[in-house]
Amino acid sequence: MTTLRAFTCDDLFKFNNINLDPLTETYGIPFYLQYLAHWPEYFIVAEAPGGELMGYIMGKAEGSVAREEWHGHVTALSVAPEFRRLGLAAKLMEMLEEISERKGGFFVDLFVRVSNQVAVNMYKQLGYSVYRTVIEYYSASNGEPDEDAYDMRKALSRDTEKKSIIPLPHPVRPEDIE
């Protein structure tokens, strides 16, 4: 039976099998520790019965309440290749959405590579829609051009009029993101 639990510092030494995917953004240990210290409830791991890590989600709460922009943000979601197509990503997303609801968020958002159609389709099936395109959001490392991202959003119950998911008509640049 899969266990969904809070991510711990010890998990930093056990999740390399998940981060080997070329579409998974990886960060230095201080970055993960910052999230663990500031937003521990948004950092969740899926663990197999034998203790092997199957996947994780890392996020945060951010934005302005006054401007109805307080929201949950998915910084990273990844499932190890051998545990894909089991519904783990959907379950992890559901947990982050529930936490964001409890925190009074208007929506949940995330960024995904335009080329990652498997992920884009999964997010659409989970109720997310493309809010805007962010030009050259992802830096290329091998001489390839930088890649655009979709900023995808799902309105939560606090956004009764669904204003947070009305798509922007034009793409934006990374420096224009608040």
Curated annotation (Swiss-Prot):
Domain N-acetyltransferase: start-end pairs: 2-157
SUPFAM superfamilies membership: Acyl-CoA N-acyltransferases (Nat) (SSF55729)
Tell me yes or no: is Nucleus among this UniProt entry's keywords.
Answer: yes
Q: Does the keyword NAD apply?
A: no
Q: What InterPro entries does this protein map onto?
A: Acyl_CoA_acyltransferase, GNAT_dom, NatB_acetyltransferase_subunit
Q: Which reaction does it catalyse?
A: N-terminal L-methionyl-L-asparaginyl-[protein] + acetyl-CoA = N-terminal N(alpha)-acetyl-L-methionyl-L-asparaginyl-[protein] + CoA + H(+); N-terminal L-methionyl-L-glutaminyl-[protein] + acetyl-CoA = N-terminal N(alpha)-acetyl-L-methionyl-L-glutaminyl-[protein] + CoA + H(+); N-terminal L-methionyl-L-aspartyl-[protein] + acetyl-CoA = N-terminal N(alpha)-acetyl-L-methionyl-L-aspartyl-[protein] + CoA + H(+); N-terminal L-methionyl-L-glutamyl-[protein] + acetyl-CoA = N-terminal N(alpha)-acetyl-L-methionyl-L-glutamyl-[protein] + CoA + H(+)
| Enzyme class (EC, first level) | transferase
Query: Where is the major localization of this protein?
Result: cytoplasm
Its GO CC terms are:
cytoplasm; NatB complex; nucleus
Extract the GO molecular function terms from the UniProt entry.
protein N-terminal-methionine acetyltransferase activity; protein-N-terminal amino-acid acetyltransferase activity
| Listed EC numbers | 2.3.1.254
Q: Where in the cell is it found?
A: Cytoplasm; Nucleus
- Record family assignment: Belongs to the acetyltransferase family. ARD1 subfamily.
Q: What function is annotated for this protein?
A: Catalytic subunit of the NatB complex which catalyzes acetylation of the N-terminal methionine residues of peptides beginning with Met-Asp, Met-Glu, Met-Asn and Met-Gln. Proteins with cell cycle functions are overrepresented in the pool of NatB substrates. Required for maintaining the structure and function of actomyosin fibers and for proper cellular migration.
What is this protein called in UniProt? N-alpha-acetyltransferase 20
Can you name the source organism? Danio rerio (Zebrafish)
